[in-house]
Amino acid sequence: MSRPPLPPFDAVAAAQKARMAEDAWNSRDPAKVALAYTEDSRWRNRAEFITGRAGIEAFLTRKWARELDYRLIKEVWAFAANHIAVRFAYEWHDDSGQWFRSYGNENWEFDDEGLMAVRHASINDLPITEADRLFHWPPGRRPDDHPGLSDLGL
C-alpha cells in the first residue's frame, strides 16, 4: 500500500504529509489513523513504547477515551529525505471538565511507500481554562481558514 507523497520530501510534500496526519488524528478514528503507519511501526509516545498497527490502534483508542473534545494543529519544523519533524499543539479536556493544551514535537521516519515507520513524540500538558482555548472548530478537520500554530503565537 502506497501513501503519497513519497520520500524524498520537499517543503510542499512535508507540509502535505503533516496536514494529512493532522486531519487523520482530528478524525479520532484509531483504525483510520493506524493505516498511515507500517505494519511494524515503532513509536515512543511520551514514556510509552508501541509497536505495530494493532498497538497503535489500542493506544489511540485509550487516548481518545481520555482526551475528550480533542483538537490538533501540526506544523512542519524540518525535513530531509525520508524524515519530517513537526511541532504541534492540541486541546482537550478530561472527564472532570479540566481543559489542557498539550505541546509537543514529533520526529517521523517514512518507508519508501510513504508509510510512517518510526514516530518519536515528546509532549507536555498545560492546564488551561475553557476561556483560554484557541481551537474552536467543530469536531473533525481543522478548517483551511483557521490559523495555524505560528499564526496563533504558539
Language-model region placement:
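Short, low-complexity N-terminal intrinsically disordered segments enriched in polar/charged residues
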Residues: 1-39, 149-154
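A solvent-exposed, acidic/Ser-Thr-rich amphipathic alpha-helical stretch
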Residues: 13-16, 30-84
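A beta-strand edge to alpha-helix "cap/lid" segment located at domain peripheries
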Residues: 1-9, 58-154
